[in-house]
Design a protein with these regions (language model features):
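Central hydrophobic cores of alpha-helical transmembrane segments in multi-pass inner-membrane proteins
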Residues: 10-25, 38-53, 90-104, 122-124, ...
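Transmembrane helix-loop-helix hairpins at membrane boundaries of multipass inner-membrane proteins
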Residues: 1-8, 22-119, 192-202
């Protein structure tokens, strides 16, 4: 079992990479690339399930850890591991990959080899971001995640893919240059890219305060653009409008939010505390701004983009509230957001494929024709707006309660107003698409309800929303080990003179109200 535990993260990284290479060399006939990609994604998902099955809740620090020298100069290590912060995010990424492939099964008809190879490469990069504990290794995966996504948007966009891809690439790539400079500065000062080592040296070292502020700002800028945090959201609506459904449902928000928690707060707690009031204010503006713009959208892709801005801003508020309970709620809501958005994007993609428009006023009265589609769309909508007994309620309740007791009652009231507006625009979307009189478009086309294969993909997502709402302790038990500071423990996979700290084991943080 120890051999499996020591190699499981490497397998999770290598299997989708090998699948991408196999898709690239396979003949493009009889949907062979589709089947190779699906089999690869299912195997990878199965590997990710090993992590929660063998995760030790009472053990602090990183688990399934591997730390091996890779490049001697500069000293870059193959250092990977997971803790409660990243555990469920790895599983979520594994779950969404086969769902994304099924969602693309009949919509990607040309250059399928390119699509599925790049999609699996994107998955490799996402897994790498979540498990990397060497900052240069992390940076490599971070940059790798940008390239396949930009190419996929450019090649498979709906109307103006190249322009949306260029905007996405410039917005997200340019801030990565200061991040690289910051990493090199840290290496010049410490001789290490290792996250655990840097965490200790920064907290106990004698660095220039002004230089460290600039380094922390470079980290924050790269992550804030990727979330995105208001007002750095200029790429979001075009990307959601043009990105293939599989891509939009897989990547929305998770990488930037995780990186904020792991690397910005985890490495620079003092600097994070200094900028927290500003980020809290921007997050609340983003919650309300996104919700108000979502209310007036006529295009459902753009509505989903601004809804995402509002919901991701709520998670940002929880992160920079700097309370342990807020961090629990943030990670939980990232998971819920990933599940709910996957269901909504998949269902909206099916509607778009049938009716060839994303204009909301072109729809109407579809509940009678597409009852299964309508039912699952309503369930996903209720999950997004936070109905009790669904996962969205748990995440929003934890976030708002932690903000109320640990940050500001005024900010909490403003954030709660954004949540209420979220219910308004999502329920209005349901009403306009599925209820009321039929539009000329929907009346002229029979419409196809979900077939058994699509139901088999969507039903587990609906069940997962319910399980997350009814049994939150199952998920929170692992999350808490990643955000609560346990006693320091010696890592078996780290150098003998390095102590493993979980990402949140920072004495200057986590002192706010629980």
């Amino acid at each position: 079992m120890n051999e499996i535990n020591n190699s499981i993260l490497t397998l999770i990284l290598l299997v989708p990479l090998a699948g991408a290479l196999l898709v690239a060399i396979a003949p493009d006939r009889a949907k062979l690339p589709n089947w190779i990609a699906l089999l690869t994604a299912l195997v990878t998902f199965g590997l990710t399930l090993h992590l929660p099955a063998h995760f030790v809740l009472g053990q602090g620090g990183f688990q399934f850890e591997v730390n091996r020298p890779w490049i001697e100069s500069p000293a870059i290590h193959y250092h990977v591991g997971v803790d409660g912060l990243s555990l469920w995010l790895v599983v979520l990424a594994g779950l969404l990959a086969p769902i994304g492939i099924v969602a693309s099964w009949n919509t990607i008809k040309e250059r399928r080899k390119v699509f599925y190879a790049l999609f699996l490469l994107q998955q490799t990069a996402m897994f790498g971001v979540f498990v990397s504990l060497d900052l240069m290794l992390y940076y490599g995966f971070w940059e790798l995640s940008l390239v396949p996504m930009a190419i996929l948007i450019a090649m498979y966009g709906r109307k103006d893919g190249p322009r949306a891809a260029l905007k996405f690439f410039l917005f997200t790539f340019i801030p990565s240059a200061p991040l690289l400079v910051a990493l090199l500065w840290l290496y010049a000062q410490t001789g290490s890219f290792d996250f655990v080592t840097l965490q200790i040296l920064i907290s106990h070292g004698s660095f220039s305060a002004s230089a460290l502020c600039w380094v922390a700002l470079a980290f924050l800028l790269a992550f804030a653009v990727k979330v995105p945090v208001f007002p750095l959201h200029g790429w979001l609506s075009d990307t959601f409008s043009e990105a293939p459904v599989a891509l939009a449902m897989v990547v929305a928000g998770k990488l930037g939010l995780y990186s904020m928690l792991r690397f910005h707060i985890g490495l620079f707690p003092v600097q994070a505390r200094a900028v927290a009031p500003t980020l809290i204010g921007l997050a609340v503006i983003g919650i309300l701004y996104g919700a108000c713009l979502a209310l007036v959208q006529r295009d459902f892709w753009r509505l989903m983009a601004f809804a995402a801005l509002s919901h991701l801003s709520l998670i940002t508020l929880a992160i920079y509230g700097l309370t342990l309970t807020g961090w629990e709620g943030a990670v939980y809501q990232i998971l819920n957001h990933g599940v709910v958005d996957a269901a909504l994007f998949l269902l909206l993609g099916l509607l778009y494929d049938q009716y060839s428009t994303s204009q909301i006023n072109a729809y109407g009265g579809l509940a009678a024709k597409l009852p299964n589609t309508a039912t699952l769309f309503v369930i996903a909508t209720l999950g997004m707006i936070g109905l009790p007994m669904l996962g969205g309620f748990v995440g929003e309740f934890i976030i708002l309660s932690s903000t109320f007791t640990g940050v500001s009652r005024s900010w909490t009231i403003a954030a709660a107003l954004g949540v209420i507006l979220g219910a308004a625009y999502m329920l209005w979307l349901v009403q306009r698409i599925f209820y009321g009189p039929e539009s000329p478009l929907t009346a002229s086309r029979p419409g196809n309800d979900l077939h058994p294969g699509q139901l088999a993909v969507l039903a587990p997502l609906a069940v997962l929303m319910l399980v997350m709402g009814l049994a939150p302790s199952f998920w929170l038990a692992a999350i808490q080990t990643g955000v609560h500071p346990p006693p320091l423990k010696q890592s078996q996979a780290s150098p003998a003179n390095v102590l493993v700290l979980p990402s949140m084991s920072i004495p200057s943080l986590g002192e706010g109200p629980r």
